[in-house]
Amino acid sequence: VGSEMCIRDSRVAGAELDFFHKAVVFGIWAVAVVYFYWTLSSRSFVYVWDYANYLLKQYDAEAAFAQSAGAGLAYIFGSMADDYTNFITLFTEFPFCLTSHTGDAYAFCQVFCILPTLLVLLAGLVVKVGQILNVKNRTYYFLFGMTLTAAYPFLRMSAMLGQPDWFGLIFGFAILLLTMDFRFDRLEPVRVGLIFLATAAIILARRWFLYFVVGYYFAYALLLIAGCVRLAKGGEKSAALVRIKNLVLFGLASVVAMVILLWPMVSHILAYNYAGRYSYYNGGGLALEAFYHIGRMGLFNILLMVLGLAFAAKHRAPSLPCLAGCELVVSILLFTRVQNTGSHQFLLFLPGYFILFLLGTAALAEGITRRRNLKLGCWAFVLMLSMSVRCSPLTTLAIPGFVIEHFPIQIPATEYFICLLYTSDAAD
């Protein structure tokens, strides 16, 4: 049902999926099922600390709904002001209710209740970016873009550790899909309604997705204002004024409605000292966060983004790299004022990074006729490298598990989190 709703969102955004797109999505999902099953079956992992939070919440949600529907709904809505809301438990109950209720079962269930919808939205995003860039070789572009983004290690990292936070990316990708080429020339009720609902849902999924929301809408507003300035300079002042009017009207109405809808969460945020409460998790500020981002990207993805920026400069298409870059900078600066990111919080940066990834895959696809075999070989190598990255609470660098086992690397950031984990366990 969720996937069908996402396909409808893609249609509203003008990014419909054809048979080839759906076949690739299904193939990726099938590989993910095998990957999750094999990885979870071949490891030993104790679900404690943050890695048990949602499992325990799922138990509590089941117990509440077992009493009555009213008690269950009260449990869900009673967490609106909490850092961990119970919103996600509504969507992860099936097929978890059919399992042995272990931590591994909870992690594996996400392949069925979250991943299909996430992949459909990601596919729509890949198609939409290709449309904006006017990519001519759509087949190779979609194949490269869809596989390289879906295989990115830190997309699945938190899910493998029992944290279903990638659920929020469903709505993050929906926001991008619905807004990237929308310029508010007129207010489309269905589109703006979906944008509002996706924004509310991503905030409900996890509080820290607000950093993505603020960063993205700030960058998006700047992009629209820059477009209006160009229109005005070109003699189309009336069209520019219409865009500004519609943007302001939608923005004000959305903010008021969002504050009313999420008032328990908003009032808690305004009254709570997050910087003081989470200063314990601030291990090095912006410098450490920059190290995390470089390590989590990996050399090949960094090269892919550089290739994409060169492609955008060559084709004079600055809107997407500027949108993604501005969103990332604002989100990173805001987040590091409070703490540094763990693997699950890194998810809030993936929409921006994936736009940059897709710029790179567009460059690869456009030049596929030159050194085709070399490029296909590099693509296959990067996929295998991405799929072999160890999913661990202490994973700082995106490198395969067998490399870590044979060539252990001592990293100050990793040592910090080891100390943090032991200290938290001792406190408990």
Predicted regions located by residue number:
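Transmembrane-helix motifs of polytopic, lipid-linked glycan transferases
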Residues: 105-135, 174, 178
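Membrane-embedded, lumen/periplasm-facing catalytic core of multi-pass transferases
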Residues: 382-424
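Signature aromatic-anchored transmembrane alpha helix within multi-pass, membrane-resident enzymes
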Residues: 247-255, 364-400
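Hydrophobic, aromatic-rich transmembrane alpha-helices
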Residues: 8, 121-126, 221-231, 298-320, ...
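Short acidic/glycine- and proline-prone juxtamembrane loop motifs at membrane-interface regions
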Residues: 157-167
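Membrane-proximal lumenal/periplasmic loop motifs of glycosylation machinery
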Residues: 40-52, 65-90, 111-112, 294-295
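Conserved small/polar residues in nucleotide/adenosyl-binding loops
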Residues: 1-10, 422-428
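Loop-to-helix entry region of an early transmembrane alpha helix in multi-pass inner-membrane enzymes
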Residues: 82, 86-120, 158
